[in-house]
Amino acid sequence: MVRLFLGFVEAPFFPGAIYFLSCWYTKREIGVRMALLICGILLSNAFAGLISAGILSGMNGVGNLASWRWLFIIEGLATLVVGVIALFVLPDFPSTTKWLTQEEKVIAQGRLAADAGSDSVLDEEKVPITRGLIWAAKDPRTWMFACLQMATTASISYSHFFPTLIKQLGFKNNTTVLLLTSPPYLVAFCWALSWAWVADRRQIRSIPAGISQCLAMVGTILLIAIGDSLWARYGFSFLVACGTFGVYATTYAWLSSTITQPPIKRAVAIGLANTCANIASLFANYFWLDQYEPAYRQSWGCLLAFQALGLSCILTIRFTLKRANKKFESLSNEADVMDPLFIERLNADERKAVQNGFRYIV
């Protein structure tokens, strides 16, 4: 029951945080910010190993409590303290943040409206969540990104079993195993953040995501081919970590800068993509059964299949958005020769955004 309650309150945090960032930053700024949020997972994985190693080796029996109990107490208290602080220091949306002046609110909303190609800097009219759900569900791009996120989450499933994979190197001491889990995540943190910076600076998304996906596939293929070499396996895990988290740190920024109008549609699209990603967590854990020890070739083979699916999604989204941008140019410059069926598929907000110069980031 405790785990059920924990999952219930945790579930909305990540998509809510993604949507929150998209309500403050333009598409030229959001990549690095979202990468920092997502790279928090990498830092938590890296330092959780270090913290766990220290607690498990040094606090067993303190206060007549087992070390694993201290692990939950310390990490739980840290989360609680940060959550309470966030209640007071985290701003609300640009239109409702109390400590912003009216002029600052208009500026904050205006820069986002201009970025999305909208004329209005005022609060949008309240739209029912059901309407946003219908809009998002009928948009093929929502499901392209949802499929990409599902494939990426399945590819990251190895991280849940990384300590077990490290044990296959021959280490029996749990402290040593936990310490060895940190370096791949720290390197992946630098990789993901660097590519997010490049993506923002160059206003590209598919190329960084595609390069990271290819790197993950190379690492996975090498793990399958040279799985008997223990330290080679550890080295190749760096490639997989960099690649998979490099994709993960890029795609949510890509989604939020693609489905921009209206905001309720963006919120639902982010939620649907995150839901599909969580579905992957349900089945991907079964890739790592004990019967696949010690090389886990079948497990890595499953990951390779989902990485290939992710790469195909990246290429499909790139092709779809590039073709849409070409049609947008026609709509802006030569509306009289524009495909009328294409125009009908755009809602009023999207049509206005296109005429104001909005283009997808590819």
Where are these regions (language model features)?
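Paired small-residue
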Residues: M1-F5, W231-L239
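Cytoplasmic helix-loop-helix junction between adjacent transmembrane helices
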Residues: V2-G40, I55
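Intracellular juxtamembrane helix-capping segments at the cytosolic ends
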Residues: P12-T26, G246-P262
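Glycine-rich segments within core transmembrane alpha-helices of 12-TM secondary carriers
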Residues: G31-L65, F72-T79, I270-A284
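Extracytoplasmic gate region of multi-pass secondary transporters
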Residues: G49, R131-W197, Y248, Y252, ...
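Intracellular terminal tails of multi-pass secondary transporters
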Residues: L87-L122, L272, R297-V362
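Structural signature of the two symmetry-related core transmembrane helices
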Residues: I207-L222
